[in-house]
Amino acid sequence: MRIGLYGGSFNPAHAGHLHVSRTALRRLRLDRVWWLVTPGNPLKDHGVLAPLDERVAQARALATDPRIAVTGFEGGIGSRYTADTLRWLVRRQPALHFVWIMGADSLGTFHRWRRFDEILSLMPVAVIDRPGYTLTAPSARAAQAFASARIPEADAPTLATRPTPAWAFLHGPRSALSSTALRTR
């Protein structure tokens, strides 16, 4: 089974998250996408973060597609960093083929994530285009560091079963929605 892992604060979850998930399901030929609602992002302001249980409930109410599952399990395993969460999942579910899903906006700061290189060694990564990042994301520090691991977009359906490191940048219709913009309204 091919599972896309889409981590984030989901503060709040919105139609843009659904767009990214459906794009990944279709373009990567995934069976499921799991939304990993984080208890707290070390790189973001926690002062504006709604409680985890509220964000999980709101995300579940939005994600009515049966192929999308919402979980807040990271809090239960005491994980603070994506690399730890992904290592935990890979060890417990060795038969599954995981792909980490991220928006192109996150690729610009990916090199600041703790052990970002380990994430790329644990599973392939799919970067979904976002407005304003089409041209800048591929020149991001992490993208340059792993330039040789980038696969052609036409090969994206094979990403889940490729040896790591491997990543793909997926162009296409983009959603301008963002949780930050929704919170400031």
Curated annotation (Swiss-Prot):
Gene3D superfamilies in the record: HUPs (3.40.50.620)
Main enzyme class: transferase
InterPro entries hit by this protein: Cyt_trans-like (IPR004821), NadD/NMNAT (IPR005248), Rossmann-like_a/b/a_fold (IPR014729)
E.C. number(s) listed in UniProt: 2.7.7.18
Keywords: ATP-binding, NAD, Nucleotide-binding, Nucleotidyltransferase, Pyridine nucleotide biosynthesis, Transferase
Single GO BP term: NAD biosynthetic process
Source organism, top-level taxon: Bacteria
Pathway stated in the Swiss-Prot or TrEMBL entry: Cofactor biosynthesis; NAD(+) biosynthesis; deamido-NAD(+) from nicotinate D-ribonucleotide: step 1/1
Entry keyword Iron-sulfur: no
Reactions this protein catalyses: nicotinate beta-D-ribonucleotide + ATP + H(+) = deamido-NAD(+) + diphosphate
GO MF entry, a single one: ATP binding
Keyword tRNA-binding recorded: no
Pfam families named among the record's database cross-references: CTP_transf_like (PF01467)
PANTHER family, per database record: NICOTINATE-NUCLEOTIDE ADENYLYLTRANSFERASE-RELATED, PHOSPHOPANTETHEINE ADENYLYLTRANSFERASE
Function, in words: Catalyzes the reversible adenylation of nicotinate mononucleotide (NaMN) to nicotinic acid adenine dinucleotide (NaAD).
Homology family: Belongs to the NadD family.
Protein name, UniProt field: Probable nicotinate-nucleotide adenylyltransferase
Organism: Methylorubrum extorquens (strain CM4 / NCIMB 13688)
